[in-house]
Swiss-Prot record:
Record GO biological process: methylglyoxal catabolic process to D-lactate via S-lactoyl-glutathione
Family: Belongs to the metallo-beta-lactamase superfamily. Glyoxalase II family.
Lineage: Bacteria, Pseudomonadati, Pseudomonadota, Gammaproteobacteria, Enterobacterales
Annotated positions binding Zn(2+) 2: D57, H58, D127, H165
Reactions catalysed, as given in the entry: an S-(2-hydroxyacyl)glutathione + H2O = a 2-hydroxy carboxylate + glutathione + H(+)
Native source organism of the sequence: Salmonella arizonae (strain ATCC BAA-731 / CDC346-86 / RSK2980)
EC number(s) per entry: 3.1.2.6
One Pfam family hit: HAGH_C
PANTHER family according to UniProt: HYDROXYACYLGLUTATHIONE HYDROLASE, HYDROXYACYLGLUTATHIONE HYDROLASE GLOB
Pathway: Secondary metabolite metabolism; methylglyoxal degradation; (R)-lactate from methylglyoxal: step 2/2
Protein name in UniProt: Hydroxyacylglutathione hydrolase
Cofactor: Zn(2+)
Keyword Methyltransferase among UniProt keywords: no
Amino acid sequence: MNLNSIPAFQDNYIWVLNNDEGRCVIVDPGEAAPVLKAIDDHKWIPEAIFLTHHHHDHVGGVKELLQHFPQMTVYGPTETQDKGATHLVGDGDTVLVLGYNFSIFATPGHTLGHICYFSHPYLFCGDTLFSGGCGRLFEGTALQMYQSLMKINTLPDDTLICSAHEYTLANLKFALSILPHDSFINEYYRKVNELRVKKQMTLPVILKNERKINLFLRTEDIDLINEINKETILQQPEARFAWLRSKKDTF
């Protein structure tokens, strides 16, 4: 399969997977126009849409795309049933698309019904995990988001994290505000900054690398624990996650 990204809005990415025959699945099409152009440019044949959650910048283009391609199956969680989803899916389900099985698992936190789609090595994680960060808690709790990230963290090292937003540089700035002397984060920040200066995307990233630069996946890391302990003593990793998320919200 071939992985493609379509920029949308200010910082969204609409992901598209296509096979050698040109059949494709579209992930979180927040608007239709750039998707329709890409379909025309590449001569793709849309087969399905994956929706991760109900926010408009992820579902806004679904109904228009269905007008052009009514044969498409639109998979999504229950919270997307009025956003164009034709097949509701949830935790533990598997869907066969383009000849590949995609496992679906619940990742509440950003929204209560948020889900991810995984077919090795591709993980479409919407607004749950970003490179260097994680989604804001609009509906769920810090504990729910922590548990969702821990699910993702069990996936293979070479998993490709296909997040829905270009937030990497800002997330790394936050990480360096907490661990300013972390050599790996500093090195990666320089690389990411060079990419963004050239208007190049920083995604997808592999999970092995993400475990090193994403503080939200490092809540049991001794350097991070020592830094948090300067302000407050938190015994549980989920409490340290909540502390980080609160800090990021006001960064």
